[in-house]
Amino acid sequence: MLRRLLLSVLIASLAACSSGNDRAQAPARPRGSAPITLSGPPSRATQACFADLAREDVRSSPLPDRDYGGGCAVIGAVQLIDFGVPTTNLRAMTCPLARTFVAWVRNGVVPASREILGSEVVRVESMGTYACRGVVGGSRASNRLSEHGTANAVDIAAFVLADGRRITILRDWRNPDPAVNDFLQTIRRSACRRFGTVLSPDYNAAHANHLHLDLGRGPFCR
């Protein structure tokens, strides 16, 4: 019953964020509240996603469902352990986000680095996933919960190649080297085909140092 009630509150809060109402919504529990662990089995969709990861040889660990207040929650999430390309700072990710992220790195980023840069990506550096906060940047930012608040987004800062090069979003987004520029534009296009929203330094100054990838509303690719 508690799980059902909290999920209803969460759904209502997220619906309000996407309704076009610019006024801040009053959450049932304030942000920063002590987390509440929700009991009950994962949904069928989440169980199917877990199975997809296992079938794709992705090692992951399911995480307990938790409500953090203020619309922030981690539901149907995993911790990625090993999918072939080490990635830093990954914490809770919704299972669909984890599945999409793995596919992007394996089928978009790694082949692009090999074909365009002549060296394979051996490590991805992220700036994290879950964070209970509002959207950063934009006139209505403070009124909207970020997809990070539901572990449905990941920020990517850099890629390390087998030959030792480190390609960063901050330093290399407008790199005059045509190969580096081609690589970054190629992986952004690849991300835009997979994620709901992709935000780059071309979007605003708040994204100058990373690619924001999420499975929220979209498609939106900048």
Where are these regions (language model features)?
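C-terminal motif of bacterial Sec signal peptides marking the signal peptidase cleavage site
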Residues: 13-16
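Sequence contexts marking disulfide-bonded cysteines in secreted/extracellular proteins
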Residues: 18, 48-50, 71-73, 94-96, ...
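Bacterial N-terminal signal peptides that target proteins for export
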Residues: 1-9
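Active-site acidic/histidine clusters and adjacent loop/turn architecture
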Residues: 41-125
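Proline-rich, low-complexity linker regions of envelope-associated factors in Gram-negative bacteria
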Residues: 18-50
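Second-shell loop/turn segments in exported
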Residues: 34-40, 91-100, 143, 169-178
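Catalytic cores and adjacent binding grooves of peptidoglycan-active enzymes
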Residues: 22-25, 110-113, 142-222
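Active-site-adjacent substructure of cysteine-protease-like catalytic cores
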Residues: 115-151
